[in-house]
């Protein structure tokens, strides 16, 4: 079981720098041949590219493998899970590749089909909006006879999954809110937080996350801590914000408690071995926090004019404005 570190400070520290370097080195070492996929693929590519630890030859190998896969599949990454396309768009945007021409296939185009994208519910809308906004892409035209997607439509779909308590649920009919999807929904909402209704929804979601945080600052797994840290950084909120420190410990401290020998991260505190997904999500979180501390754009904000929304968690409803 990993040993929890002491509480971190609000400024960039040697511990932060070393943690990011170790996480990046671990991913490079354990993913020698990146492929199209949620593990050993796009999240690793995104994390390494946005952290500054990316390797050009490694990224090119991913792209070549993706081209070969897309051509072998006739451009169909998945018949029903359109999050596959959104995830690929995020990775390609991060390494400077055009998702609209991957071996002759337009992998952005499926995000124009609102029905197919939202077949996966909240996940579909969140991933699609993140992907579209990451590169400032125009929403593709939907196929004939299908419902045309719009940014406004995806935004409304996401907000429909917010519970009265403020968190987001995977169940549109009022199921329990979940920290991971709440954090991801917050990232998708960020570019629209200049709207009073969106900023109020985001504030409510962050306050729900604050209440959901454990008494020791932990959200229950490496991946959950990572997602919350990414959401905080996206809004320019440091991990040490008073709303997210419990018993002197932040989610950043909690995440570092999941490090195992060798530089990887385990999924649960009782685990002794590194978990690939947890390690890649930790890399993303450490990248996001490092960028936030340096005053850089958020993890998913990859256009040149991308700013950082700033949210006052203590403001009254309607008082938040994007800065």
Regions from the PLM with identified roles:
Residues 1-323:
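Preference for long, amphipathic alpha-helical scaffolds in soluble/luminal domains
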């Amino acid at each position: 079981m990993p040993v929890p570190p002491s509480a971190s400070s609000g400024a960039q520290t040697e511990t932060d720098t070393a943690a990011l370097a170790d996480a990046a080195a671990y991913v490079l070492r354990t993913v020698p041949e990146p492929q199209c996929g949620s593990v050993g693929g796009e999240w690793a590519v995104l994390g390494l590219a946005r952290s500054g630890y990316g390797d050009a030859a490694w990224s090119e190998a991913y792209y070549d493998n993706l081209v070969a896969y897309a051509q072998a599949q006739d451009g169909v990454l998945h018949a029903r899970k359109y999050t596959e396309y959104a995830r690929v768009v995020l990775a390609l945007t991060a390494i400077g590749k055009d998702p609209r021409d991957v071996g002759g296939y337009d992998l952005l185009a499926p995000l124009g089909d609102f029905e197919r994208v939202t077949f996966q519910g909240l996940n579909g809308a969140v991933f699609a909006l993140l992907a579209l906004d990451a590169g400032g892409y125009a929403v593709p035209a939907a196929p004939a006879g299908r419902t045309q997607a719009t940014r406004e439509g995806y935004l409304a779909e996401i907000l429909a999954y917010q519970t009265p308590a403020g968190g987001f649920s995977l169940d549109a009919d009022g199921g329990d809110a979940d920290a991971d999807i709440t954090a991801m929904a917050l990232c998708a909402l960020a570019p629209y937080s200049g709207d009073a209704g969106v900023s109020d929804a985001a504030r409510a979601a962050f306050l729900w996350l604050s209440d959901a945080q454990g008494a020791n600052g932990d959200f229950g797994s490496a991946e959950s801590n990572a997602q919350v840290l990414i959401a905080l950084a996206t809004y320019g909120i440091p991990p040490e914000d008073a709303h997210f420190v419990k018993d002197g410990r932040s989610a950043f401290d909690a995440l570092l408690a999941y490090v195992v020998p060798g530089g990887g991260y385990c999924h649960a505190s009782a685990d002794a071995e590194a978990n690939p997904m947890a390690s890649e999500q930790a890399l993303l979180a450490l990248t996001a926090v490092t960028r936030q501390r340096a005053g850089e754009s958020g993890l998913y904000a990859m256009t040149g004019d991308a700013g950082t929304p700033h949210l006052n968690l203590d403001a009254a409803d309607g008082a938040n404005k994007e800065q």
